[in-house]
């Protein structure tokens, strides 16, 4: 059985790139358009991993991470921020919320796959 990764990003083109990259690597992908949509999908089924953008409407990535970490069935899943933000203060905020890692856009597809393989052995 392949592992499922939930991706949250308000950019349709970015969701497409991330999903295609992960599907080509053998993962199942569920897409969410923002943090609120991601939480709704998490209430249906817990993924093995979450990849989220930082800046999204309705609920940003930091708040999404905080809320995901409060869910008993998602408390320990790996969460990776995939964002244009690269400032140390933002990374610290992400870590404090519960992010497992941080990838800065633009990214190389193989970089995303390597991170997924590392966090989902």
What kind of region is each of these model predictions?
Residues 16-24:
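Charged docking surfaces used in two-component/phosphorelay signaling
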Residues 46-48, 73-78:
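His-Asp phosphorelay/catalytic-motif detector in bacterial-type signaling
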Residues 107-116:
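C-terminal output helix
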Residues 56:
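Receiver (REC) domain active-site loop signature in two-component systems and cognate sites
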Residues 53, 83:
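Active-site residues of response regulator receiver
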Residues 31-49, 92:
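Acidic, metal-coordinating helix/loop segments flanking the phosphotransfer/catalytic sites
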